Amino acid sequence: MQAPPSFYEGDTLEVAKKLLGQKLVHIVDGIKRSGIIVEVEAYKGPDDKAAHSYGGRRTDRTEVMFGAPGHAYVYLIYGMYHCFNVITAPVGTPQGVLIRALEPVDGIEEIKLARYNKTDITKAQYKNLTSGPGKLCRALGITLKERGLSLQSDTLHIELVPKDEHISSQYKIAAGPRINIDYAEEAVHYPWRFYYKGHPFVSKK
């Protein structure tokens, strides 16, 4: 079942933790690619110096952050790596959750091809398929075309995992500082990165 619009409403930190263990799905050329979310980061601009929307900064790139929760915010870093975020909080409150890592589930062969241009890969390469925000976007085929897309769409959405299949029974949620935000002054220390401790696909232990 797809996560309903109400799933994305409420406090961004709570939504971030709720996203752990759910499945991110992208349909590419009719083929389902997906992964279980195992690592996220919350961004609570305009008061969060690590957020693109800090200070209420409103640009063409960040405009989607000011819209309704439950939409995709995709951007490029270093001019080459895409990052996928889920918009949270009410309209006009630019907050979101960066999906940092997934455990691949569906479309494994397509994911391998997207990452390595081959399907015969090593165990180390397999663990590297979706263990980072840029990696998972490449694996699932998420690009700037998906920016602003509703997560109620048929092609891009979050699938709720039934409780009896949820990996939360195997891993504990850990919290810590977010990654690669050295510019963010005191926000560097906010423990707004949430992940499954010990999960092999987490980007940074």
UniProtKB/Swiss-Prot annotation:
From which domain of life does this come? Bacteria
Which one of the record's GO molecular function terms can you name? alkylbase DNA N-glycosylase activity
The UniProt keywords, alphabetically, are: DNA damage, DNA repair, Hydrolase
Q: Name one Pfam family in it.
A: Pur_DNA_glyco
- Which segments does the entry list as coiled coil? none
Question: Mind telling me which InterPro entries this protein's record contains?
Answer: Formyl_transferase-like_C_sf, MPG, MPG_sf
UniProt GO BP: base-excision repair
| UniProt family annotation | Belongs to the DNA glycosylase MPG family.
Name under which the protein is recorded: Putative 3-methyladenine DNA glycosylase
Origin organism is Bacillus cereus (strain G9842)
